Amino acid sequence: MSVIKKIILLNLFIILFSATQIVAGNLNILFKNLQNAQNIHEAEKLEKKIWDDWTKHPNSKYLTNKLENATYSMNHQQYQIALKLFTDIINEDPKWAEAWNKRATLYFLIGNYDDSLKDIEQVLNIEPRHFGALSGRAQIYLSYKQYEKAVDDLQQAKTIYPLIKSAKSIEVIKKIIKDLQI
């Protein structure tokens, strides 16, 4: 390989690595601010910014566009198309948490909870602060009547995002657990 090609490749690597670091740094700031949000309006604005970051691939506009197309298909009940697109994205970049999360959502929508849980595990391995994945897994645990696990996930989501709306159901679920023990 020529010296010029090596320099070009090195520069591309540096640019891509830098973009990834900027996104990670931005997310860290957003999560810190989310934990300290004083009201729901402020928290929801931060939540939207986090989702915006999660749904944008750090290095590939192509993958971002593909995720948008897959999400559109999912939202319009074109589930087979969406599944293929989400799976293609995961195969192209298995370290992009949001691709796994979107496919987990699709599996949830079509009632395939076991595969949804598997994808949620991947999401949380990549991005442990993914309050959306935690809330989604809690919904699945509720459908399986695994109430303690649902509470654990909702409490974990609340630790990350203290004003998250899904945390309001924690006390209701705890009451269900208590009633079942009687």
Where are the language model's segments positioned?
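TPR alpha-solenoid repeat register
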Residues: 99, 133, 166-167
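Alpha-helical adaptor scaffolds
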Residues: 60-126
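Residue register within tetratricopeptide repeats
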Residues: 41-44, 80, 114, 148
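Canonical tetratricopeptide repeat
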Residues: 102, 136, 169-170
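N-terminal leader/linker segments that initiate helical-solenoid repeat arrays
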Residues: 20-68
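Terminal, low-structured helical/coil segments at or just beyond the last alpha-helical repeat
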Residues: 29, 56, 152-182
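Residue-level recognition of tetratricopeptide repeat
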Residues: 96, 130, 147, 163-164
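Register position in tetratricopeptide repeats
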Residues: 75, 109, 143-144, 176-180
